[in-house]
Amino acid sequence: MLHIVDDFDRQGFAVLPNFIESDCLQQVKEGCQQLVDNLAEQLYRDGVISELYSTEPFARRMICLFASHLDKTPTIFRPELHLPAFYDLFAHPKLLDLAKLVLGTEIRLYPNYSVRPKLPNDPRTEVLWHQDAGYTRTDVDALRMMNVWVPLVPANEENGCMQFIPESHRLGVVGHQKEEFYLQIDQEYLAPRMYSAIQIETMPGDAVIFSNL
C-alpha cells in the first residue's frame, strides 16, 4: 500500500481499483435501497407519486421517483447512515490499514460520512470546485485528514465523476466564495490551474482517497 500513500502525498489523492469487495458493497447498496424505500413510501402517502417504482434498478429508481419533483430530491443522506448496513464499510480492514499508513495509528472516523445521490439536471447535486477544508477553519491544514469516496454506480465523465487538480493540496486552505448551493474556490486560485484538472472515472468496488485540501 505504500505506493498509494505516495500518490496521496504527492498528488493529494489516490485511486484504488477493486478495493472494496462486492459483498460489502452490496450490503451498503441494500442499506441505501431501504432509505429510498422509505422515501418512496412517504411520497406515495403524500400523494406526490402514484407508483413506487420498486422494480426499477438501483441506479435508476431515484431518477424515476423524483423526475417530476426535483425540488423534493434529497441531496444527501447523513444522519440516516447510522445503520448496521454501513458499519462494515466504515470499519473495512483495508481502509483502516491504509488510514494508519497515511495518518498514523491514532485515527478516528469523523462523523460527517454521507451518501450523495446525483440526479441529472439538478443543480443542487452539482458540487462546485472546493476544498473540504474550505467548510471549516482556515487553520485546519494543521490536521492531517484522509477522505474516502466509494461509488455505488459507475461514475464517468458523461454522468458526472470526481475531478481533481493534482498537487493543489500543497496550496493549503485557499479562499472560497458562497454560491447558491455550495462553496467554490476563488477564481484567482482556480483559473490558473484548471488546465491540469483530471477526470477520475470509477466503477463500483473502486475507492478514492483524497486530502481535505
Regions found by a protein language model. Name each.
Residues 127-145:
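Acidic, His- and aromatic-enriched active-site or binding-groove loops in soluble protein domains
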Residues 107, 140-144, 155-156:
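A short catalytic or substrate-binding loop motif that flags glycine-/basic-rich loops and adjacent residues
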Residues 15-17, 108-112, 161-164, 209:
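A structural signal for short, well-ordered beta-strand segments and their strand-loop junctions
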Residues 2-10, 17-129:
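Non-heme Fe(II)-dependent double-stranded beta-helix
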Residues 155-213:
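Double-stranded beta-helix
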